[in-house]
Amino acid sequence: MTRYPDLYVLRHGETQWNREGIFQGVHDSPLTTMGREQAAHQGKILNRVISDWSTVDIYSSPQGRAKTTAEIALAGVNRTADLHAALREVDTGDWAGLHISDIIDADFRMAKPYTVEWLSAYFSSPNGEGYEVFKTRLLEFLRSLQKPTVIVTHGMVGFVLRGLYLGLTFEQMAGQVGGQGVVFHLSDGREIVLKD
């Protein structure tokens, strides 16, 4: 298994569309009050586990919800995140902007979250980004990292990036946990979910 530096992966805080059950993909919606609180909590977690911020790189997706999360989480650290296009959310094509119930009507596999069927459906959205293209951009990013790195990104990016780091197969990735307001710490081929 390829060895990578430690990662601290954050999914953006809750957005208005997350709350309403609308797929965002390449679109954006603002963080809710809860989302801003989640980002602040992630910042507290990071400050507890990173004693010397000069030893880490920090990257964020260029999409607004991730950038705002990074700004809130890094407040008081005197560091900003470098924006990296590889960390933008998967393009869900024609599903972007649709409610999850409409997507389930179009592809029943989306009704089974965190299963192989669900993951397969996610990457077969009409006019969306396929898994191999998505995986390639994330692997290129992962291989470019030289030191411990904080990454502020999106649900599916974090899901697949963490799976690649851990050496999981596509099928194994489906069983991972997700979440907002937490930090996924990856080190030496293992993952710990930091909640407090």
List the model feature ranges, each with a label.
Residues 75-137, 195:
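Phosphate-handling substructures
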Residues 13, 61-63, 86, 153-156, ...:
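Short, well-ordered beta-to-alpha junction loops that form the rim of enzyme active sites
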Residues 5, 11-79, 129:
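Active-site-proximal alpha-helix that buttresses catalytic centers in soluble enzyme cores
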Residues 166-195:
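Domain-level recognition of soluble alpha/beta enzyme cores
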Residues 74-80, 143-149, 188-190:
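Short glycine/proline-enriched coil/turn segments at helix->beta-strand junctions
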Residues 55, 97-100, 105, 147, ...:
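A glycine-biased structural micro-motif
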Residues 30, 77-85, 169-177:
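Short hydrophobic/aromatic-enriched beta-strand-loop microsegments
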Residues 7, 56, 144-156:
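Generic beta-sheet signal
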